[in-house]
């Protein structure tokens, strides 16, 4: 970053402003609003300065370096380039922060564009590179931030000490304030300027928060691309105090989790269950009963082969509040990024999703039904049993010439798509790594025309790869 954003407390501190025109007038109003003890150096002043002449000291003379004595901050706002340069050089020699208006090269600090909801202040800056863009951003933020935001901050300041007495844990207080600030009830009371009612609402909330249990939100992280997160999923992971995540959740998505949250890996890979499901269930209950806002973050959609239903059953038995944020499942996301439509009027009237894992009782799926030619078959976690899947489909009537694709790390920058026919499935699977999705059906052939993502990634058929290896 070119500049460090920070807020300076100028109340009663000496600040020098050089200039007496309209630009200097704007800076004077801003500095006085911040409580600065302002000295203004200029032979002449705009008439409007006289409206608040009793709030600053005016020296009707040209600037000299001696004017810097005792100042902590300096602003040059003249149209005289030589004067501005002298102010900059003199202040620099004394190690003072100096701003030359509209001259970033001669400024050790700059004034940002400000959205004022005192005591809430929002500052936006481009470092002088794009002032029009900054103005547009400020206008957008002005329209988004409610006018009662400052009043809400003042109110919370009055209740803050009481919150510390009632809720000894920092995490408990943080949770209380997050829920309060998100409450439409509190916002409505403040909108009506019912300050007494709003303060009473907060105090009542503190009494309830003392014995409050936490909650769990089951969140689908989508297939990998952070851009495919839903807005609600993003909100939940940024509000979470504890996040239990699977190995399928991409690092880019984990980077979006709030920095002070506790991250717990309960990752699973096919054939390598690093954390038993029972332990995951125990952790969910333990963290929630400690009063935490817990997010259970799963790749894809939590109810699509993600054991989300099993985890919610445990929470229900324990009386822990929960909610669910669906995600884009890999079958929808990865195939779209691979240019493979799941259904097509000419090729597939339906799509079937199955898991390649064996059921606990060893029962086989209905292969006769899965081998139907008018549907697309999508197999999650099927690499390890690819040879068995291939044999069963062919033996139950699916043509060995049926187009197939294996989508590896779908929707991410490392996406790779291996294509071939059903006869090649086991051989292609041996070249793929998890997480991968197997797609079987005539729609795969459309990829040759519809592929759009991952230019330069592997798109050859099994036959071409075999030739290159010979």
Swiss-Prot record:
Chain segments carrying region Uroporphyrinogen-III C-methyltransferase: 214-470
Classification via SUPFAM superfamilies: NAD(P)-binding Rossmann-fold domains, Siroheme synthase middle domains-like, Tetrapyrrole methylase
Binding annotation for NAD(+): 22-23, 43-44
GO MF assignments: NAD binding; precorrin-2 dehydrogenase activity; sirohydrochlorin ferrochelatase activity; uroporphyrin-III C-methyltransferase activity
Binding sites annotated in the UniProt record for S-adenosyl-L-methionine: 223, 299-301, 329-330, 381, 410
Catalytic activity: uroporphyrinogen III + 2 S-adenosyl-L-methionine = precorrin-2 + 2 S-adenosyl-L-homocysteine + H(+); precorrin-2 + NAD(+) = sirohydrochlorin + NADH + 2 H(+); siroheme + 2 H(+) = sirohydrochlorin + Fe(2+)
Pfam family of the protein (one): TP_methylase
Keywords attached to this entry: Cobalamin biosynthesis, Lyase, Methyltransferase, Multifunctional enzyme, NAD, Oxidoreductase, Phosphoprotein, Porphyrin biosynthesis, S-adenosyl-L-methionine, Transferase
Endoplasmic reticulum in keyword set: no
EC number(s) reported in the record: 2.1.1.107, 1.3.1.76, 4.99.1.4
Residue stretches spanning the membrane: none
Active-site residues, record numbering mapped to chain: 246, 268
Region (Precorrin-2 dehydrogenase /sirohydrochlorin ferrochelatase) residue spans: 1-202
Function: Then it catalyzes the NAD-dependent ring dehydrogenation of precorrin-2 to yield sirohydrochlorin. Finally, it catalyzes the ferrochelation of sirohydrochlorin to yield siroheme.
Family of this protein: In the N-terminal section; belongs to the precorrin-2 dehydrogenase / sirohydrochlorin ferrochelatase family. In the C-terminal section; belongs to the precorrin methyltransferase family.
PANTHER family on file: SIROHEME SYNTHASE, SIROHEME SYNTHASE-RELATED
Descriptive protein name: Siroheme synthase 2
Organism: Aeromonas hydrophila subsp. hydrophila (strain ATCC 7966 / DSM 30187 / BCRC 13018 / CCUG 14551 / JCM 1027 / KCTC 2358 / NCIMB 9240 / NCTC 8049)
């Amino acid at each position: 970053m070119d500049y460090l954003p920070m807020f300076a407390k100028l109340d009663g501190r000496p600040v020098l402003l050089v200039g007496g025109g309209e630009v200097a007038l704007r800076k004077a109003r801003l500095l006085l609003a911040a409580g600065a003890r302002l000295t203004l150096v200029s032979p002449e002043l705009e008439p409007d300065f006289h409206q608040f002449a009793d709030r600053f000291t005016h020296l009707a003379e040209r600037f000299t370096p001696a004017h810097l004595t005792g100042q902590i901050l300096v602003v040059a706002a003249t149209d005289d380039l030589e004067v501005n340069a002298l102010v900059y050089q003199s202040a620099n020699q004394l190690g003072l922060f100096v701003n030359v208006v509209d001259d970033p090269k001669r400024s050790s600090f700059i004034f940002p564009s400000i959205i004022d909801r005192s005591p809430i202040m929002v500052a936006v800056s481009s470092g002088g590179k794009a002032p029009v863009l900054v103005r547009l951003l400020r206008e957008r933020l002005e329209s988004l931030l409610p006018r009662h935001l400052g009043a809400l901050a003042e109110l919370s300041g009055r209740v803050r000490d009481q919150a510390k007495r009632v809720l000894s844990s920092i995490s408990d207080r943080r949770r209380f304030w997050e829920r309060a600030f998100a409450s439409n009830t509190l916002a409505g009371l403040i909108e009506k300027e019912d300050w007494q009612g709003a303060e009473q609402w907060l105090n009542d909330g503190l009494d309830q928060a003392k014995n409050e249990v936490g909650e769990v939100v089951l969140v689908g992280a989508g297939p990998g691309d952070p851009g495919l997160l839903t807005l609600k999923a993003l909100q939940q992971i940024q509000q979470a105090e504890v996040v239990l995540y699977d190995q399928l959740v991409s690092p880019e998505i984990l980077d979006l989790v709030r920095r002070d949250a506790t991250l717990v890996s309960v990752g699973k890979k096919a054939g390598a269950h690093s954390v038993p499901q029972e332990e995951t269930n125990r952790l969910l209950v333990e963290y929630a009963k400690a009063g935490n806002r817990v997010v259970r973050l799963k790749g894809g959609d939590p109810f699509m082969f993600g054991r989300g239903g099993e985890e919610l059953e445990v929470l229900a038995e324990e009386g822990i509040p929960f909610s669910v944020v669906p995600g884009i499942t890999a079958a929808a996301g990865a195939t779209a990024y691979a240019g493979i439509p799941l259904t097509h009027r000419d090729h597939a009237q339906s799509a079937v999703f199955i898991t390649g894992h064996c059921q606990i009782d060893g029962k086989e799926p209905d292969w006769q039904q899965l081998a139907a030619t008018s549907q697309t078959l999508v197999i999650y976690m099927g690499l390890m049993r690819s040879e068995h899947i291939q044999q069963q489909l062919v033996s139950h009537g699916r043509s060995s010439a049926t187009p197939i694709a294996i989508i590896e790390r779908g929707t991410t920058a490392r996406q790779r798509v291996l294509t071939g026919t059903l006869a090649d499935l086991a051989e292609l699977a041996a070249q793929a790594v998890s997480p991968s999705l197997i797609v079987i059906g005539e729609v795969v052939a459309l990829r040759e025309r519809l592929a759009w993502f991952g230019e330069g990634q592997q798109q050859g058929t099994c036959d071409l790869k075999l030739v290159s290896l010979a």
